C-alpha cells in the first residue's frame, strides 16, 4: 500500500471539499462548534447591518470588508474539516466498490445453490473456489486457500487462510486465488468487517472523544468570558469618552470583530480536522481505529502486552524432531504422535503428521475406519488426543499436550516423568522451542519439539518503544524456560508464562489499577477478553473474528511492530492539538495587545493622542485599520495551519519535559510574535492600497 500521497490534497478531494465547505454553513452544523458558531452569528449580524445601512443609502466599505472576512473565517474552518473528511472518504469510496453484488455458493444439504450474498445469514455454509469473491465474513471450516486481500489491506501479496488455528478468519469482498474452502458465515450483512471499515473511516460520522469535548467546553468557557468583556467595553468607552469630552466610536461591527479576534477561533476551527486526520493517518498505515478515544489512549500508553503466537512469532510452530523415552522406539513414538494429530487441523498438528511421514514414511490413516474419537484441544486441560475403539470399546487412549498438563495427567494415573525426559524437556525449552509430550494409556512415550520462529526486526522496534517510555511484556502459554528464551530473542522487557485468558485479564486489570494505560496486541479467540479490557486493543487482521470484534483497533497488515506507528500517531494527535491550542491562546493575547491600544489610544485627549496611545506600540494606521487587519489575520491563520493540522507535528522520542519546553518555545512564543508581525504587515498593505 502506498503510505504517502504524492499530492497533499488531490484534485477530486479538493473539489468535493470546496462544495462541502458551503454545505456546512447550515446553522445546525455550525451549532456543533460553539466557538465557530459565535463567528457565524457575528458574520450574519454584520452582513445584516451592512445591507440595512445600504437600504437607507449608507455604504460602509469597512462593514462590508468585516462581513466578508468573518465569512471567510467560517468558511476556512469548514474547509479544514471538509478536507480531513474528504481524505478519509476517498478510502471509503474504494471500499464501497469492493462491496459489490456478490453471488454466493450456499451449501444446502448436499447441493450448492447460487444466492445473492446480501441474503446470507449467520451460520450459513458457503463454498468458495479459485476465482470466487468471498461473499461474507466467516470462519473456514475445511480447506486451505490463497486469498487476495488487496481490496481491504492494499497489499498485493496474497495470504494463506486455512481451517483451525488463528488464520481461519476470512473477510467478505476478498478473492480466493487457489484451492477450495468451506466457510461458515459469522456476520450479518450490514455488520461485516467491510461495513465496519466504511463506517469507521467516514469522518462525518466520527464521534468526538472525551478530550475533544473537554477542550470544546474550555474554549466555550473562554469565549463566554471574552463575550462578557466585550459587552462591557461600550459602557467603559462611553464613560471615558464623556470624561474626556469626546464621543465613543465603538460600532457593533467593531465589537463583533474584537470578540472574534479574542476568542480561540484558530484551534476551534481546526479541532475537528485534527481528530479526523488522526484516524486518516492510521488508515494510511493500514490500521483501522474504531474510535478516536483509542488513538488518544495510544499516545499515552505505558505498558504493551504482546501475545507470543502469531504476534511475536510467525504463529506456525513446526515439529522439528522426536525424542523417545527410554525403551521406546522413535518410529513408534512418531506413529503414535501422528495418530494423535490426524484430526488436528492446527498448523502444529499437521506439521507432526508431515514430520512422521517424511522421517519414517508413516502414511496417514482414516480415523473413522479405526473407530477413532478425536479429543479436541481444551484451554483448561491444554491437551488433545484420540481414543481408538474396537467394537465400541476404547482400546487405546493417546494424549498429547504441554509439559505441565501431561505431568498432572500422569500424576492422576500414578505415574511421573523420568529424570532423563525432564532434562530433555528443559533443554528444548531453553533453546526457545516448545516441548509437546505424548502418552499412551499411563505411559509417557516421549517428546516432540515444536520450533517457534521469531519475526524479524522486532528487537529494534521494541528498543524504539523503550525510548518512548513503553514497557513491553510478552504473554504466552509456554513454560517459563521457553518463554524466557523467546523473550530474550525478541527483545521484550518482561514475559508472563503459562498464561490463560484469565491471567491475561488479571494482568491488565492489575496494571490499570496502578494507573497505567495498557495496550494489548493479539490475534486469537483466547485474546478477546484481554483485548476488550485493554485501553488500546489491537487485533491482527489475520486473527479470528472474535479477536477482531473485541479490539478497538485492527491492524490490516498483522504486524505487531506496527504499534510504534500507532503510538507515534497517538502522540502526534495529542501534541498537535496541544500545540495549536497553545498557539491559538497566545494569538489571542497578542491580538488583545494589538487591537485595544489602537481602539482607545485617542481617549483622554482632545488631540486624539492621549496617554493610552503610548500602548499602541505597533503604530497601526487607524482604529478601523487595526480592527480589519486583526480580522484578516485571524481568518488567514486557519488555512495556513491546515497542513500542520492534517499532517501533525513531527514526533521525536524525547522526554515529556523537553517536548513541553520545545512546543512552548515554538508555538507559545511563536503564537505571541507572529500576530504582531502579521497584523502590522496587513495594516501597512491596507494603507498602501488605500482600502481604509
From Swiss-Prot:
Keyword tags = ATP-binding, Cell inner membrane, Cell membrane, Ion transport, Magnesium, Membrane, Metal-binding, Nucleotide-binding, Phosphoprotein, Potassium, Potassium transport, Translocase, Transmembrane, Transmembrane helix, Transport
* Protein EC: 7.2.2.6
Location of this chain's protein in the cell: Cell inner membrane
Q: Which residues bind ATP?
A: 344, 348, 377-384, 400
Q: Where is the active site?
A: 307 (4-aspartylphosphate intermediate)
UniProt-listed Gene3D superfamilies: Calcium-transporting ATPase, cytoplasmic domain N, Calcium-transporting ATPase, cytoplasmic transduction domain A, HAD superfamily/HAD-like
What GO cellular-component annotations does this UniProt entry give?
plasma membrane
Asked whether the keyword Cell inner membrane is assigned, the reply is yes
Q: How does the record describe its quaternary structure? A: The system is composed of three essential subunits: KdpA, KdpB and KdpC.
Q: What is this protein called?
A: Potassium-transporting ATPase ATP-binding subunit
Which species?
Leptospira interrogans serogroup Icterohaemorrhagiae serovar copenhageni (strain Fiocruz L1-130)
